[in-house]
Each structure stands twice: as C-alpha cells, then as structure tokens.
A protein has these predicted regions:
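Glycine-centered coil/turn sites that cap beta-strands in beta-rich domains
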Residues: 254-268, 272-286
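Extracytoplasmic Ser/Thr/Pro-rich, glycosylation-prone low-complexity segments
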Residues: 1-253
Length: 286
C-alpha cells in the first residue's frame, strides 16, 4: 500500500535533512520552535559599545574563538570563521568563497551556516587612476551575549555585487547569525534579516542554509531564488531557526503486534518535494 500524506505550506517548517535538522521561520505559527524576530543592534555606529568590529572591503575571513563549545551535525567546535560573503564555518579556513551554490555540494566551506551567501562587498565609492573600483569598509560585528549565553555575528553595510555599481543605491544586506549552544546536544542557529534584497538574477541569487563537515548533508532554505513549499521569501523582519527539535505534533506509536514501530508525522518534505509517499506492506490481510 502507499499513503500520500497532506500538503505542507509556508506555515510549516522545512526539512528534515538526512541528519535531522529542521528550518523554522517566523511565519511557522503554532510550533514551539518558531523563532521570533528580535533584532539587537551590535554595531558601535548604531550606539552599541559592546560589539567587536571586523572591517573589510571585499573577500576576507576572520577566525575567532567561541566562548563555549558548539555542537553542529554531531561535532563539537570551539571556533568560528566569519566571511565577508555572508557565511560562517566551524572549521577554520582562509578561503572567502564568494561563489554560492546549492547545499549540500562539494564546493564552498565545510561545516557552514550560510546566512546570506553571495558576493558581498563594501559600498563602491569610485575608481582609482587605473580604473579599479574603490570600496568602503563592510562591517562584521561579533559579540558574546553572556546574559543569554549566545554568540551574535552581524553583517552591516554589506552590498551585493550584482548592484554594486549603483553606489549608495546598491542592495545592502544587513543580517545576523546567532548561535545558541545546548548541553550535550546540537545547538540552535537563528538567522535574522534586518535589511535584505536578493537581486542576483544571473548569479544564483543568494544561498541560505546549513551544511555538515563532509559536505554530504545539509538543508537549503533558498538558492537561485527557489524556495521549498514550506519556506517564506526572504524579507526584512524575517527570522529563521535551524534546529534538531522535531515539530510538536510528531507522534511515535508502538504496537506490540507490529515488528516495526509506526510513526505518525505531518508531512515535512525535504526542501523541494511537495508531498511525501509512505509505502508499507501489511503482515496479513485485514
């Protein structure tokens, strides 16, 4: 027999991937894991004197120690590499990887969280005598919120290469990746979008998602301006949460007369499958 379980929508979480990560967004109402958009400005230019600032014009990375151990895809990490191109990696790297691709794939950084993976730069302010572009500094601000035991990384004044020649009118991306460690569990990852555009028509747009240390498992929220049926288009004020916490209405039911437990679960397909087919064989005729 085959049963096709119901049609999911944008108010449902995306996933799981092969490891068990789901992506909840702030429009997934009715789930305990749904994130709430709560922007906390880190940039000292915005009045917060706590954030540390990494300045770069283009294609740079910086590796910093974490104040806690963070488990991701079952592996414990103690540092994070931040890239000007909108991602972090838990494995130190000197590669900035500006060319985004689908997740998972054997390209780009390992053990990655792509908050807004695309070719990002500081604002273009002119050209030099040789005709080379001149960029202002992009700002990456990072801070440990000890009161809430979370680590926040913010990208500010990050301009999209696709519209970079527009100068101050170019598309600016301002977003945060927030790490929440858990005791002896995979940590939660929240991404918040303060200002966001996705203009790269000919450059795969941006990629948002997570990927493991072997680049074999991952969960894409969006790539090439394509979204799973359960995802919401990136907009200002959107929050995402990547977590291994299953939806509240997941029910496992064991029956002693059956050799294998049966699980009842609302349809949570992998990113681009609109339905789930459950196949089974009855032990005897009913």
């Amino acid at each position: 027999y085959a049963i096709t379980a119901g049609i999911p929508g944008t108010d449902d979480p995306t996933g799981p991937d092969e490891y068990g990560y789901f992506a909840y967004d702030s429009t997934d109402l009715g789930y305990s894991s749904t994130p709430v958009y709560e922007w906390m400005e880190l940039d000292p230019e915005g009045g917060n004197l706590l954030g540390n600032v990494f300045l770069s014009q283009d294609d740079s990375v910086m590796t910093i120690p974490l104040p806690f151990t963070f488990r991701f895809y079952g592996v414990d990490y103690i540092s994070v590499t931040m890239s000007t191109n909108g991602w972090i990696s838990f494995i130190p790297t000197d590669q900035s990887d500006f060319y985004n691709c689908y997740i998972p794939a054997a390209l780009g950084p390992y053990a990655m969280v792509a908050g807004y993976w695309d070719d990002l730069k500081g604002m273009k302010t002119g050209v030099d005598e040789s005709g080379n572009p001149i960029f202002a500094d992009m700002r990456i601000i990072y801070w440990y919120d000890s009161a809430n035991n979370r680590y926040i990384i913010e990208w500010n004044k990050a301009y999209n290469q696709y519209t970079i020649d527009l100068g101050p009118a170019a598309s600016m991306e301002k977003f945060q990746i927030i790490l929440y460690p858990k005791q002896e569990q995979d940590g939660d990852i929240v991404i918040q979008y303060h200002t966001v555009d996705n203009p790269g028509i000919t450059t795969n747009y941006c990629t948002v998602g997570i990927e493991d240390h072997n680049q074999l498992r991952g969960l894409t929220y969006t790539h090439a301006n394509t979204y799973p049926v359960t995802a919401t288009t990136l907009t200002p004020g959107l929050a995402l949460k990547f977590t291994t916490t299953w939806p509240d209405n997941y029910v496992a039911n064991e029956d002693e007369t059956l050799p294998i437990p049966v699980c009842n679960l609302r349809n949570y397909p992998n990113p681009f499958n609109p339905v789930t087919t459950i196949s089974f064989t009855a032990k005897q005729k009913g």
